[in-house]
């Protein structure tokens, strides 16, 4: 502690000591108050509620002197700066607010510094105006933080800040570059109808609950590189990462409360970037009715996505690089996508998803991701099938799906062709000798009589397989069918075999012609 002289009320000189534990500027001319844990503090920095009366006097004295340096100050009780005008730079860095603090409609004309400030109970900055830089780096909000309707006219920094309760930025205006780099949102983060006039970064930010950007306007690029949308519970491991080439059934069956990442009706006038972003299994991201003036600047790089997240928008011009869509070949994947979308859209979910799959297929096709395009086309047609009865043998499209996966599934078409061959071969094998005409020798040199008698025989299993293959190849293998049953089987295989072979050829052609 340093010592200065100050006049006492009776004119005598008394010893006044300045607090050196915190910044000198904030406690200049403040007398020594008390000791705490062996350290000496002035009335501003003493960390105890019993100083309230003296603190109020010191606070009023600083404000009346237009002294807004409160670096490291410990505020013991509720405080209101509502509609207060800070004509000079307001320095609240490292300050501690024990009770609710109210900055509603306050005006910060020369900058606001809240670096490493701690708000223990609640912070109200509704409709506050920041004309110069606003710095909340590493600030900690233990209770609700309300910035609804606030206006940030210059650079704004919330980098590495911690919001342990709801963070409300509804309708907030960010007119210059804004940084939420590494910011932690452990409760709902609400940016509904916020306006970002300059680039905004949420790189490495962590969203544990809802991230809502409904109706937000982005006039410049917004970045979400390596952001995490997941519950930070250390006992939960529910990431979907771009390193995963497949997503198991548990991934597509969320447990617990869904984590919404909501860009509904948002407007992106420049770009959007999700790079290396991690999403929890329970995340549901929606861009429904969002508008992109430069859709080619919407970039999703090395991250994991779900097709139903892009329902009700047009993603054909988006840039998808090294994106993991999950196992689109998994049985029931389409049905799970429909169920996920129906959790938020009760009506026309099937129609929206069908359109989305077709648009994603176009995007993949135009960017030479042909295997991915094949999967999306298949899923688009399968959505329409699932709207009807599951088994519908009277509809041609149902057979098209069953026998070749709409001409997109080579293994299925091959398996169907093989099944036709084997099933007809088994039918020929179980048939008795009366099914077949006797073989007649045409080797005239070997004939010793003018008439020779032959006996019909059943086909062995190997002979049946060869016979079935010959019929399928439109040959006329011997023995020829002798009764109606055998002739009917041969006729049906003559039709079905070549048709299925054509479906297989079509699927192969679609796979390689691109």
Go through each PLM region and give its residues.
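N-terminal leader/targeting and pre-domain segments
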Residues: 1-396
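Pore-loop/selectivity-filter region of tetrameric P-loop cation channels
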Residues: 398-410, 433-499, 503
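Membrane-water interface at transmembrane helix exits
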Residues: 424, 428, 432, 436, ...
């Amino acid at each position: 502690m340093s010592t200065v002289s100050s006049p006492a009320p009776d004119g005598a000189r008394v010893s006044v000591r300045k607090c050196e534990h915190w910044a000198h500027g904030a406690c200049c001319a403040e007398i020594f108050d008390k000791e705490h844990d062996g350290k000496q503090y002035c009335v501003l920095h003493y960390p105890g509620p019993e100083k309230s009366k003296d603190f109020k006097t010191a606070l009023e004295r600083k404000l009346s002197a237009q002294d807004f340096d409160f670096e490291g100050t410990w505020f013991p009780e509720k405080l209101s700066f509502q509609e207060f005008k800070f004509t000079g730079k307001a320095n609240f860095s490292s300050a501690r607010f024990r009770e609710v603090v109210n900055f509603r409609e306050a005006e910060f004309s020369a900058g606001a510094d809240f670096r490493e400030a701690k708000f223990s109970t609640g912070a109200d900055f509704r409709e506050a105006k920041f004309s110069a830089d606003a710095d909340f780096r590493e600030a900690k909000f233990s209770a609700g933080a309300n910035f609804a309707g606030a206006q940030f006219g210059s650079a704004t920094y919330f980098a590495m800040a911690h919001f342990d309760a709801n963070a409300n930025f509804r309708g907030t205006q960010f007119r210059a570059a804004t940084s939420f780099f590494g910011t932690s949102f452990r409760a709902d983060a609400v940016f509904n109808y916020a306006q970002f006039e300059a680039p905004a970064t949420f790189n490495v930010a962590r969203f544990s609950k809802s991230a809502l950007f409904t109706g937000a306007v982005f006039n410049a690029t917004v970045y979400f590189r390596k952001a995490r949308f997941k519950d930070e519970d250390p006992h939960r491991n529910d990431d979907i990462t771009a390193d995963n080439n497949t997503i198991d059934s548990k991934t597509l069956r969320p447990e617990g409360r869904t984590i919404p990442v909501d860009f509904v009706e948002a407007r992106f006038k420049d770009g959007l970037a999700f790079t290396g972003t991690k999403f929890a299994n329970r995340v549901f991201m929606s861009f429904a009715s969002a508008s992109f003036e430069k859709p080619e600047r919407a970039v999703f790089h090395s991250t994991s996505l779900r097709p139903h997240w892009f329902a009700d928008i047009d993603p054909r011009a988006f840039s998808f690089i090294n994106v993991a869509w999950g196992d689109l070949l998994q049985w029931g994947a389409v049905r799970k996508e429909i169920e996920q979308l129906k959790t938020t859209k009760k009506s026309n979910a099937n129609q929206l998803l069908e359109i989305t799959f077709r648009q994603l297929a176009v995007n993949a096709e135009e960017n030479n991701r042909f295997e991915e395009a094949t999967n999306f086309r298949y899923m688009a047609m399968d959505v329409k099938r699932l709207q009807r009865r599951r088994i519908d043998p009277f509809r041609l499209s149902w057979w098209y799906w069953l026998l070749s996966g709409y001409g997109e599934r080579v293994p299925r078409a091959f398996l169907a062709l093989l099944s036709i061959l084997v099933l007809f071969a088994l039918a020929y094998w179980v048939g008795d000798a009366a099914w077949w005409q006797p073989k007649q020798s045409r080797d005239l040199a070997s004939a010793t009589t003018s008439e020779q008698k032959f006996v019909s025989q059943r086909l062995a299993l190997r002979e049946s397989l060869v016979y079935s293959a010959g019929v399928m190849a439109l040959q006329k293998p011997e023995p020829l069918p002798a009764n109606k049953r055998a002739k009917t089987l041969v006729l049906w295989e003559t039709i079905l075999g070549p048709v299925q072979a054509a479906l297989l050829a079509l699927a192969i052609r679609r796979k390689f012609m691109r």
